[in-house]
């Protein structure tokens, strides 16, 4: 009798020596018993390292901030969820009854987390070389399509993509003050980011400009950019 997981292994292009690791990687926290959160943590670190290393060699002239933004595009949840859907990972997830009924097997965050957990499982199964080979095989097409020009996005977009790549809530912007005459106003905006304990601030001649300045400050505070890219 064939093992249903063999089909997923063929799609992933990897055969587990210890298939229990694969099962654990596909087990959501809503399912009774052990779950994939620790493997997800490990896989996230490996994914960021491997993609960072690949970008470092692929774009020798790119600056640190550009490399960070390119990496954020490749490792964001949307990208990983697309991979998972291509492999039909959702069909193999072990979910609690509530998540199953609510369509958790289609949810972007759950699919992205499962892909990271599978990366962690591959690493534990046969080591870094295997994990690197699979990551590059899966994300190679997207990697080859990137150019440093892709980083020429405004700070709000870059901040949003970075937070999405970490599975975080989107930033919240609030106008806290408006000064000056109607024809020459200055807007003061706060930006609240889940990963930062303090809000960042920006001001400018329009709400849009003030939000961009606050977003740029958040990127610096997060260590994603150094303020000179």
Swiss-Prot record:
Its EC number is 3.1.26.3. It is found in: Cytoplasm. It catalyses: Endonucleolytic cleavage to 5'-phosphomonoester. InterPro entries: dsRBD_dom, RNase_III, RNase_III_dom, RNase_III_sf. Keywords: Cytoplasm, Endonuclease, Hydrolase, Magnesium, Metal-binding, mRNA processing, Nuclease, RNA-binding, rRNA processing, rRNA-binding, tRNA processing. GO terms for cellular component: cytoplasm. Residues 154-224 form the DRBM domain. Pfam families: dsrm (PF00035), Ribonucleas_3_3 (PF14622). PROSITE patterns: DS_RBD (PS50137), RNASE_3_1 (PS00517), RNASE_3_2 (PS50142). Residues 5-127 form the RNase III domain. The keyword rRNA processing applies. Its cofactor is Mg(2+). The active site is at residues 44, 116. Mg(2+) binds at residues 40, 113, 116. One of its GO terms (biological process) is mRNA processing. Digests double-stranded RNA. Involved in the processing of primary rRNA transcript to yield the immediate precursors to the large and small rRNAs (23S and 16S). Processes some mRNAs, and tRNAs when they are encoded in the rRNA operon. Processes pre-crRNA and tracrRNA of type II CRISPR loci if present in the organism. Homodimer. Belongs to the ribonuclease III family. This is Ribonuclease 3. The lineage of its organism: Bacteria, Pseudomonadati, Pseudomonadota, Gammaproteobacteria, Pseudomonadales. The gene is rnc.
